Amino acid sequence: FSLAETKFQVIYVGDDKKDLNDSSIVLKLTYGNTTYLLTGDATNKVEKQILDKNLKSDVLKVGHHGSQYSTHAQFLKAVSPKYAVIQVGKDNSYGHPKDVTVKKLESIGAKIYRTDKDGTIILSSDGENISFETVKTDTNG
């Protein structure tokens, strides 16, 4: 579906009643020539199921808070993001994001933004370029 100049494509609709993380909707957003892949809490299981889709995106909202159960190598290769955004609470009890996930993102040259270190992350785009602004508060670094 479309909203003004923005196109939304539902890549995956989860129905796994046993694992709520894999019940996440995966959504690809296209605005002009910029693309964004929003993965919710999807894990490797979902990532493998959607590899046959056009996943190439400028920005990846990293799945499952950067846990070791998401962002596998084949998926990252298919997405090839320039930027990665990890939504994660500071000093969370799960230890997210995991170092292995951060290293995978670094290895492909993605610029990483993290809410635990960068605070609020604001993306802006004119359809050609993407810019980021971060706003730190007392609760996130």
Regions inferred by a protein language model and the residue ranges of each:
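Core dinuclear metal-dependent hydrolase active-site scaffold
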Residues: 1-59, 117-141
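Cap/insert and terminal regions of metallo-dependent hydrolase folds
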Residues: 49-120
